[in-house]
Amino acid sequence: MLSPQTISYKTLLEKAWPIILANASVPLLGLVDTTVIGNIGTAQDLGAIAFGALIFSFVYWGFGFLRMGTTGFAAQADGAGDQEEVRAVLARSLLLAIGLGLFLILLQWPIKQAAFSMLSGSESVEKVAQSYFSIRIWGAPATLCTFALMGLLIGLGNSGQLLIVQLFLNGLNIILDIWFAGFLEWGAQGIALGTVIAEWATVAFASVLIFRELSRREICETAFFPIKKLRDRGPFVKLLSANADIMIRTLILVFSFAYFVNRSSSFGDVSLAANHILLQLISFAAFFLDGYAFVVESVVGSALGSKQNKMFDSAVKKSTILAACTALILAAALWIFGGFIIAGLTDISAVRFEAVKFLPLASAYIFLSFAAFQLDGIFIGASFTREMRHAAMLSIIIFLVACRFLIEPFSMFGLWWAMVLYVVARAAALLLFYPRLRAAVGL
């Protein structure tokens, strides 16, 4: 059990690094898929995977609330020592995940039609991509259940097991993709089938890990899922409300990046390509900052559940210092070595020149983003989701207003300044609600 005395920098780092590795392992899967199809499949297969992966990434990102909502409530229940409620949190989240997953399957035709109406590819690519979609959609319930299961592991502070689950998912997926697409030459359909099988296998694997973990805590004296607690609608309504708030916040975040990319395209193909590269570097930095945010979600939730105010303050202070130092190192590294990194990512001189020109602003974004990541983690751990929704709404308004007044006179520099202002506004908006959070939890 964590305490103010055991919340050391070493402890936080030990909890963060498995999460960072788990996050960083995700792009490896896409790289392997691309390599397999790029060497064995057709151009249509490669294009189909690009389209299909984009659609599912967008859809599943919108359901990220299942992970975040589960983490906060599980951490609080675990901190309070209410292990029966931990199981109830898991059950509610899994029921919601299964329901939403089945809903996606039922609506697969309109989702597919809407998605492909917004994408412009050749007829042959779209035909293969639709086949890919029709197979992968059957993994939706499994993917959403995995979000809930991973959320529980984070809430319980088991970042090591989270890494194991993520490596199992990616490792099995890679093996199946190589087998189906590489050896059997099933192309994009083989990639989709391998992904679906891996997703369902991961649900089973993670469920076994969690069952053993909860059994180790000797909390299975009665039925594993407490039916009596599940009949109480209050906590389920609370979970639905929290998840709705997080979903709105997430969709606003998705919109902000989509808007940034769309405005980038108005400056030409070179500017769009340059900003795409810089956003990939920002995404890489997010793997590290997310690690600390996930840890603070767990520790803050546990501290509030156990009513250890000193533990809350210690966790917030030390994890924020670590995140700030990490962000500074990442930003400095990008500023100093960014030119070499960009040169390795593209040999198009115009794109390289354009990307290097905005390296300082991309570096500033990375450094200043640590506060938004940390505050997100604190608010998720405390289940203060309504305030997260309000903060997201406020910050996107600031971003759009900044774009309105900065882009015309300053062109692409204005767009980047607006983006940097946006990440600062995200943190500032959450800080407005931070005193309310502390007061509500008795700090």
Model-derived regions, located:
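Short alpha-helical transmembrane segments in multi-pass integral membrane proteins
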Residues: 1-16, 74-141, 183-247, 300-365, ...
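Alpha-helical transmembrane segments of multi-pass membrane transport proteins
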Residues: 10, 25-26, 63, 104, ...
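Transmembrane helical elements of multi-pass membrane transporters/channels
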Residues: 14-33, 135, 146, 169, ...
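Transmembrane alpha-helix boundary and packing residues in multipass membrane permease domains
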Residues: 19, 23, 35, 72, ...
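Helix-terminus/linker motif at the lipid-water interface of multi-pass membrane proteins
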Residues: 28-47, 116-123, 179-186, 247, ...
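Membrane-helix boundary and inter-helical linker elements of multi-pass secondary transporters
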Residues: 39-42, 76, 155, 184, ...
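Small-residue-rich hydrophobic transmembrane alpha-helices
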Residues: 46-106, 143-162, 274-338, 370-383, ...
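Short runs within selected transmembrane alpha-helices of multi-pass transporters and secretion channels
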Residues: 67, 135-154, 162-170, 191-207, ...
